[in-house]
Amino acid sequence: MPECPCGSRTGYARCCAPIHDGQRQAVTAEELMRSRYAAFVLGRADHLYRSWHPRTRPPEVELAEVRWLGLTVIEVVGGGPEDETGTVEFVARYRGGSLRERSRFARRAGRWMYLDAE
């Protein structure tokens, strides 16, 4: 079983695949962020669109031709199973550089959704 690209060191089939396929929801904001990173790696624009809050979501999600190399979570504030909001700061490395971002998440109808980034 291939390792999940989210960095969990768990097999993809038991980690982010059930979230990508809609079989279960992310329990925390960090889990949603990791599933979104894995979706970028695997070209799962469908998951990126579904997990983006409708208030801030673009009409469609386009994926750039990027070779993603790894993810490091720096800080998580809130975003737990009982929270309504949360932020996750991370560094995503890709061939030729890196992206450092603080993503904001909010619950909508009980589901974690990506809101925007600072």
Task: Give the ranges of each region predicted by the language model.
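Cysteine-centered loop/knuckle micro-motif
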Residues: 14-16
